[in-house]
Amino acid sequence: MEYPISLYYDTEVSDVKTLDLCRGDDDYRKVHIVDDGHRKLVIKYLSNTFSDRRRIEGWFALMNEYRKIGLYCPNVVPNLNGELLHCDTKDGRDYYTYAEEYSIYETAEHIGKDKYKDEQGHDCFTPDVMRSLGKIASAKLDMLDWASAYCLLEPFCAPDTTDEATECAVAFVNYVRDNIPAYLSRAEALLDMFYKRQEDLRKVYHSLPTSCFQADLNDSNILLDSNNNFVGLIDFNLCGKEPILNYAVREALWGISDNRLFGEKDSRLYFYDEELDNLRISLFLENIGYIQETYHFSSSEKDAFPILFRYINSFWWFHIDEIKLIKEDDNKINQLFDWLERQMTRDDIRLP
């Protein structure tokens, strides 16, 4: 029987589906979905720079905490040797194997957007996801001593050298340099402004209250019941300890879904329309309101909010996608640059 399936089954199994999730030599990940007719398991086999025994056992511990607040997370099951986590070494490299029960609920991705979105394009589960975030924030979990993939002001793992926001800001300017150099001086000025906002944030960031979060709330990890209610999560491999304000603000921003804000090829229409951008902020504050039903921001978090917002509401991957879409449209390029400058200088939004 193929390894690592043989760690969990002592007879041949014919119902096996293998997912290759590898991302280059430094990130080896394969998932085997196995069903012998008696039990169905998701066996995960991995080796990468952000997974070791300490971290993986931390994932298990955090899953237990999520269960305590009432969220479903599939149980980790022991292998035939009684191990929850197995390590083998090949060519000096450690490979880890663990298995979970196959989820009794479907992911939002599997259910499909036509089922979980309303007529305006809002995700029906967003309010409950935000409320659960507030519960985890209120728990002030402290069992992990590493940052999540949402980390700011530091890299998440090798070979990263910066946080993801900085990576996006630099990539944006590099694209302008290589493709629309007439705008390079303005792009570089925006990058200088971004670095100033980064230093502003550095002065307050590390003193903010923290908790530990799953840190990967996409529709392939969100579990829904038969009525499309949010019930739980899978995949904790990007989890870690984060300032609550960072995690809450980013999820409140990224949890915005409204058809009026997006055009063809996912173009962000609010870059070019102040009324639509005001709608975006209104929806952001609505999401913050759901979080505040279960978590109360401290005075230090409220004071730090404008500083953090100016940083994380600026450059991200979709700005790079956008500049590629509009590179032939001088008017839109200038509007996008104006939008970025406004986000890094605005002082008109406060936490309720």
Show which residues each predicted segment covers.
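Helical subdomain adjoining the active site within ATP-dependent kinase catalytic cores
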Residues: 318-352
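Protein kinase glycine-rich loop
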Residues: 19-25
